[in-house]
């Protein structure tokens, strides 16, 4: 079985490295030539377009930045939809909203009869590399059962959440909402402690000994204090996801005040070219600057 991966960003890179490590036949298409050369040296087959990759893959995992990029690799002239491989299963890991995922799945089915599974994941590049993602899948159940063993290569948990494409994307956005708000709470706690004359490292040590600790406080806290914003998830992509959350809340006529405020803060932080390509936890630096004026 050949697994194609489209997208060589941070998450895609982690997935590819994991599959190569397990001895899987991996086909790769992406835009970063340096990464493509690296993967080729590791044993992956590199393709110049998505169509050719799709022709020679049994399953494709798509992992691109946004809805526009997803439509491009699916529907452009040399996109996946131009291939003749009618047995193809597409597992899309891109963070899009439920309507966008449903749009792609319907168009894929109507044009080619391919199977399209909405497959967003929780976890970052290191989790992917260790096979510790959490995969959330919605779409045709029989197709999910066919590829579950592939998802288990990169995941510690795989959840099938329903026949309707897009359901898993709604869960993903609701989960990512927690990332934004928890990171803001952690940032404000650090700032309050610091400006009260308390060593932020002491504050964080105590926090992480309580039930208030989170994966974010344990993984990111000390990096934030050191102003180390090496990205596992870009600030600009966090803002993109928050925008999707707010779009969903408006469609559902929901009032999400914390998410709305998060959107304002992350958007303001993202106005800095220097910050937008740093880790999302750089929101701490932004808030600290506001409190140092």
Model-derived regions: residue spans:
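NAD(P)+-binding Rossmann beta1-loop-alpha1 motif at the extreme N-terminus of oxidoreductases
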Residues: 1-63, 83, 94, 125, ...
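Hydrophobic residues within alpha-helices
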Residues: 15-16, 104, 150, 192
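Hydrophobic beta-strand scaffold residues
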Residues: 26, 46, 115-116, 158, ...
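Rossmann-like NAD(P)(H) cofactor-binding subdomain of soluble oxidoreductases
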Residues: 50, 54-55, 59, 67-133
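Rossmann-fold dinucleotide-binding core
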Residues: 96-176
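Helical "substrate-binding/catalytic lid" subdomain
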Residues: 165-286
């Amino acid at each position: 079985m050949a697994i194609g991966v489209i997208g060589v960003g941070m998450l895609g890179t982690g997935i590819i490295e994991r599959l190569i490590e397990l001895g899987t036949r991996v086909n790769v298409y992406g835009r970063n030539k340096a990464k493509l050369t690296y993967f080729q040296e590791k044993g992956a087959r590199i393709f110049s377009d998505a169509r050719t990759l799709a022709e020679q893959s049994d399953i494709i995992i798509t992992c691109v930045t946004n809805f526009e990029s997803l439509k491009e690799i699916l529907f452009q002239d040399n996109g996946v939809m131009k291939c003749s491989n009618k047995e193809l299963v597409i597992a899309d890991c891109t963070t899009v909203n439920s309507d966008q995922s449903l749009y792609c799945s319907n168009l894929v089915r109507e044009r080619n009869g391919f199977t399209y599974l909405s497959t967003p994941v929780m976890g970052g590049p290191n989790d992917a590399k260790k096979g510790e993602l959490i995969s959330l899948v919605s779409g045709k159940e029989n197709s999910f059962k066919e590829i579950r063993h592939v998802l288990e290569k990169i995941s510690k948990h795989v959840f099938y959440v329903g026949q309707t494409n897009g359901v898993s994307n709604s869960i993903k956005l609701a989960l990512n909402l927690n990332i934004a708000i928890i990171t803001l709470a952690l940032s404000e706690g650090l700032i309050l402690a610091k400006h009260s004359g308390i060593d932020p490292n002491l504050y964080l040590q105590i926090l992480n000994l309580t039930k208030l600790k989170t994966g974010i406080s344990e993984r990111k806290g000390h990096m934030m204090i050191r102003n180390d914003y090496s990205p596992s998830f870009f600030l600009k992509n966090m803002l993109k996801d928050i925008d999707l959350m707010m779009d969903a809340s408006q469609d559902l006529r929901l009032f999400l005040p914390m998410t709305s405020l998060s959107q304002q803060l992350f958007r303001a932080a993202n106005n800095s070219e220097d910050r937008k390509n740093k880790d999302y936890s750089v929101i701490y630096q932004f808030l600290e600057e506001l409190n140092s004026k």
